[in-house]
Regions:
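Short, polar/acidic, helix-capping and beta-turn segments at strand->helix junctions
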Residues: 2-126
Length: 126
């Protein structure tokens, strides 16, 4: 049976709860949801959806890189928006990173941690 391997990098925000930044299992990396915390400051700095989405993508990129993967190997993403009115602006940022158009779900939720506007998680191959 394949082992679970935890992924951790200081180039993305530390988990704010009892979970790992990502887990590798059987040749696949499963990231936890990333929110737009700047890992250098520990703060959410951007106030608009585009800025927050960019920070989320930077964080995800670092987690994927540490795991030995990247955006081009994404199989599935799950995206959470605080307001579906931000859908188009979010997609503009998302499309710059996920150029292979992986499977995706995108939903609006009532509240996200730290009252951010966006959170994204990824399943990717190694």
């Amino acid at each position: 049976m394949a082992e679970l391997k935890k992924v951790a990098t200081d180039k993305a925000p530390a988990a704010i709860g009892p979970y790992s930044q990502a887990i590798i299992y059987n040749g696949t990396v499963f990231t936890s949801g990333q929110i737009p915390i700047n890992p250098a400051s520990g703060n959410v700095e951007a106030t608009d959806i585009a800025g927050q989405a960019e920070q989320v993508m930077k964080n995800l990129g670092e987690v994927l890189k540490t795991a030995g993967s990247d955006f081009t190997k994404a199989v599935k993403t799950t995206c959470f928006l605080a307001d579906m009115a931000d859908f188009a602006a979010f997609n503009a940022v998302y499309a710059k990173y996920f150029t292979t158009n992986p499977a995706r779900s995108c939903v609006a939720v009532k509240t996200l941690p730290k009252n951010v506007l966006v959170e994204v998680e990824v399943i990717a191959s190694l």
